[in-house]
Amino acid sequence: MEKFTKLTGVAAPMPIVNVDTDMIIPKDYLKTIKRTGLGTGLFAEMRYNDDGSENPDFVLNKPAYRKAQILVAGDNFGCGSSREHAPWALLDFGIRCVISTSFADIFYNNCFKNGVLPITVSPEDLEKLMDDASRGSNATLSVDLEAKEIRGPDGGVVKFDLDDFKRHCMLNGLDDIGLTMEKAGAIASFEKKNAEQRPWA
């Protein structure tokens, strides 16, 4: 998993509440277990018209936001079913950070396991960041995970809190496998000792 230390990029505003995982990645795209290629299905029902053409009014189809790396979203983002394809789709599109006032628990935890940083802020701070993200080509935010702060285009700073363990995992690029590999030496030592003490096992 790629480390997340500091990210400076275009932030796209999506002031929609209760965006569920089916909206993030519709069920038609769940037939694969590959993590790549899902970016085309991200927000597909909002991104595309019935004939498959792009909806020009959808934020990620607008020229200023096509390469957005940060999403500023409405409350209760990621609710609904527990599909891990949702953070996969965000990451494959290029979005590495989602900022909201709240997230569904399963989606929130899945993000950390897949290299997407979900940040929770107050309604007042979200309103400011949403305004920053609405500046089109000037909608650039800097997310500093080490300092736990978001810096806007005008230099304003929004502080955020994050569990120390989750922060450690993101800073060091550790998913579940990475965490296990951190203990590889201890595991090998235990197995050797166990084999010596219990040769019959």
UniProtKB/Swiss-Prot annotation:
It catalyses: (2R,3S)-3-isopropylmalate = (2S)-2-isopropylmalate. Its EC number is 4.2.1.33. Disulfide bonds: none annotated. Keywords: Amino-acid biosynthesis, Branched-chain amino acid biosynthesis, Leucine biosynthesis, Lyase. Pathway: Amino-acid biosynthesis; L-leucine biosynthesis; L-leucine from 3-methyl-2-oxobutanoate: step 2/4. SUPFAM superfamilies: LeuD/IlvD-like (SSF52016). GO terms for biological process: L-leucine biosynthetic process. It holds the Pfam family Aconitase_C. GO terms for cellular component: 3-isopropylmalate dehydratase complex. GO terms for molecular function: 3-isopropylmalate dehydratase activity. InterPro entries: 3-IsopropMal_deHydase_ssu, Aconitase/3IPM_dehydase_swvl, AconitaseA/IPMdHydase_ssu_swvl, IPMI_Swivel, LeuD. Gene3D superfamilies: Aconitase, domain 4 (3.20.19.10). Catalyzes the isomerization between 2-isopropylmalate and 3-isopropylmalate, via the formation of 2-isopropylmaleate. Belongs to the LeuD family. LeuD type 1 subfamily. Heterodimer of LeuC and LeuD. This is 3-isopropylmalate dehydratase small subunit.
